[in-house]
UniProtKB/Swiss-Prot annotation:
Biased composition (Basic and acidic residues): 118-131
An annotated GO cellular component: extracellular space
Tissue distribution: Expressed by the venom gland.
InterPro entries according to UniProt: Cystine-knot_cytokine, PD_growth_factor_CS, PDGF/VEGF_dom, PDGF/VEGF_growth_factor
Cystine bridges: 38-80, 69-115, 73-117
Protein name (Swiss-Prot/TrEMBL): Snake venom vascular endothelial growth factor toxin vammin
Propeptide part(s) removed at maturation, as residue ranges: 135-145
Main location: secreted
Cellular localisation: Secreted
Disulfide bond is among the record's keywords: yes
UniProt function note: Snake venom VEGFs may contribute to venom dispersion and prey subjugation by inducing vascular permeability and hypotension. The hypotension is mediated by nitric oxide (NO), which is produced by VEGF-activated endothelium NO synthase. Also induces angiogenesis in vitro, probably through VEGF receptor (KDR/VEGFR-2) signaling. May also induce capillary permeability through VEGF receptor (KDR/VEGFR-2) signaling.
Signal peptide: 1-24
Organism, as annotated: Vipera ammodytes ammodytes (Western sand viper)
Length: 145
């Protein structure tokens, strides 16, 4: 493996790193590998995907650009997973189609700040902590159940 990496590094030094590829040029392996790696990258996310209970209104824009983990891991048993997150406030126009009124408002979206390749969950395994119904239909999270 070390010999392979050394050979790739030597090729990198000989060929140089292109600032951009022109149509018809081959993009070098190291650039392809780096660009496809698991990392936070700008992703378009539909607002209704993040706020599914807000279907009575129309949002402009209908999707927002946020950083989300995406990319390839070295093994098919691994998945690119967020390990760091923060919230960003974005100004969105909300349109009420019934009244034809619109207003600007700030909506919160999660951005991924750090990503790692982690083992995939087995089919049927829950995505997170189990939820128990509470009075009034609200669900509470119990990570220890």
């Amino acid at each position: 493996m070390a010999a392979y990496l050394l050979a790739v590094a030597i090729l990198f030094c000989i060929q140089g790193w292109p600032s951009g590829t022109v149509q018809g040029q081959v993009r070098p392996f190291l650039e392809v590998h780096e660009r496809s790696a698991c990392q936070a990258r700008e992703t378009l996310v539909p607002i209704l995907q993040e706020y599914p209970d807000e279907i009575s209104d129309i949002f402009r824009p209908s999707c927002v650009a946020v950083l989300r983990c995406s990319g390839c891991c070295t093994d098919e048993s691994l998945k690119c997973t967020p390990v760091g997150k923060h919230t960003v406030d974005l100004q969105i126009m909300r349109v009420n189609p019934r009244t034809q009124s619109s207003k600007m408002e700030v909506m919160k979206f999660t951005e991924h700040t750090a990503c790692e390749c982690r083992p995939r969950r087995k089919q049927g395994e829950p995505d997170g902590p189990k939820e128990k119904p509470r009075r009034g239909g609200v669900r509470a999270r119990f990570p220890f159940v």
